[in-house]
């Protein structure tokens, strides 16, 4: 290996961005095939390649950061900026859904009956499952903060307990959301109300699943003593993402479930 005279990490060539892009193509194409032709083959192939890519890319990053020491202070600074920019891009992603919702609801057209919710739509009660979901996510925000403070203070056991509680609450939220979808009195094809509701809450649910995956990886890493009180950016990034998911849900609840009903 050649001598390195700088603190930056020169990454070796990696196939995972390419396989990740391929899995994204397969998943989106697979969704279309599943929706229109009832054929899940491409979707299953896309999900499989996506899981394999995630596993191997995470493995490489953990090896580089924890075992090879490539994540120096200056590298971590770059990763922080990258995570912040990623979350900002996600804010604008969800802003598009809120724009679509408010554009449709603040000035309902005659085709909708001139009212919101549109004529014939029976909205969900915001004080039932949606309120429970809000409580669950707020509680998970508290537990992830507990985990973070425990880690910084060197209380490994407390950190693991708090992180496990956060993961359990995330899974519980996903199950509640799935049951709500199953029992909803309207579908995604029921006009602008159904499409904005299911796309906005569905993408949020997907982000909860992604965030839960991040936290599960952090939990397994902490079981193997990968994090210290001063070197734990992998966990910190996952915590930032989880707080972002919390805040988006609060806006969804107030806008779509409470005001929109």
Swiss-Prot record:
CDD domains: Cyt_c_Oxidase_III. Residues 35-40, 106-128, 184-190, 257-261 are mitochondrial intermembrane. GO terms for cellular component: mitochondrial inner membrane; respiratory chain complex IV. Residues 1-15, 67-72, 153-155, 224-232 are mitochondrial matrix. The keyword Translocase applies. Keywords: Membrane, Mitochondrion, Mitochondrion inner membrane, Translocase, Transmembrane, Transmembrane helix. PROSITE patterns: COX3. One of its GO terms (molecular function) is cytochrome-c oxidase activity. Component of the cytochrome c oxidase, the last enzyme in the mitochondrial electron transport chain which drives oxidative phosphorylation. The respiratory chain contains 3 multisubunit complexes succinate dehydrogenase (complex II, CII), ubiquinol-cytochrome c oxidoreductase (cytochrome b-c1 complex, complex III, CIII) and cytochrome c oxidase (complex IV, CIV), that cooperate to transfer electrons derived from NADH and succinate to molecular oxygen, creating an electrochemical gradient over the inner membrane that drives transmembrane transport and the ATP synthase. Belongs to the cytochrome c oxidase subunit 3 family. This is Cytochrome c oxidase subunit 3. It comes from Dasypus novemcinctus.
């Amino acid at each position: 290996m050649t001598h390195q005279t700088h603190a930056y990490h020169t990454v070796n060539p990696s196939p995972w961005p390419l396989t990740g892009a391929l899995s994204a193509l397969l998943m989106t194409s697979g969704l279309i095939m599943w929706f229109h032709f009832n054929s899940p083959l491409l979707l299953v192939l896309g999900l499989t390649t996506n899981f394999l890519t995630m596993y191997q890319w995470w493995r490489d990053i953990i090896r580089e950061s924890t075992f090879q020491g490539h994540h120096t202070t200056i590298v971590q600074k770059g990763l922080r900026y990258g995570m912040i920019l990623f979350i900002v891009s996600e804010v604008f992603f969800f802003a598009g859904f809120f724009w679509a919702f408010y554009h449709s609801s603040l000035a309902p057209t005659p085709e909708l009956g001139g009212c919101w919710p549109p004529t014939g739509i029976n909205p969900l009660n915001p004080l039932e499952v949606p309120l429970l979901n809000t409580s669950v996510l707020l509680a998970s925000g508290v537990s992830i903060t507990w985990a973070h403070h425990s880690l910084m203070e060197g209380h490994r056991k407390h950190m693991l307990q708090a992180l496990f509680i956060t993961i359990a609450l995330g899974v519980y939220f996903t199950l509640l959301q799935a049951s709500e979808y199953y029992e909803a009195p309207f579908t995604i094809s029921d006009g602008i109300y159904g499409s904005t509701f299911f796309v906005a809450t569905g993408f949020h649910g997907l982000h909860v699943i992604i965030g839960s995956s991040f936290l599960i990886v952090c939990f397994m890493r902490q079981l193997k003593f990968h994090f210290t009180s001063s070197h734990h950016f992998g966990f910190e990034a996952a915590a930032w993402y989880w707080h972002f998911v919390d805040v988006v849900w609060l806006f969804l609840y107030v806008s779509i479930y409470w005001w929109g009903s």
